Amino acid sequence: MQKILLADDDDTMLMLLKTLLGLEGYQVATLMDKAGDIMDNIRQANPDVLLIDIYLGDQNGLDIVRQIRTSPDLDHLKIIMASGVDKTEECLAAGANVFLLKPYMPNELFAILRA
């Protein structure tokens, strides 16, 4: 079972995704930008997949992905970035494996997770 860490500053989105992914059998943890040092929280959660929004309140998802890709203990992490604005090129250049344009259908996310 894959462990997925969700990072978003939208409580509603977090709860919706947590419920949908849980129903599909995934182990899900959530992380908000208010949770302190995001990198420490990612390490502590030890996920297989990180689904992260580009905009996390006062933190930037692109910067976090760049930090992950330069951290030897985290560079194996599969990263899915999401935003309501098409930032595909920026996300892939930062080190994301996949970009999802919001709103997306749950089946799109499930297909990516199964790939």
Where are these regions (language model features)?
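Two-component/phosphorelay signaling modules centered on CheY-like receiver
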Residues: D11-A29
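Short amphipathic alpha-helix used as the core "switch/output" element in two-component signaling
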Residues: L62-D75
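The feature encodes the CheY-like receiver
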Residues: G57
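Conserved acidic carboxylate
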Residues: D8
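Acidic, metal-coordinating helix/loop segments flanking the phosphotransfer/catalytic sites
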Residues: L31-V49
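Active-site residues of response regulator receiver
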Residues: D53
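Alpha4 helix (beta4-alpha4-beta5 surface) of REC/receiver domains from two-component response regulators
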Residues: D63, V85-L100, E108-A111
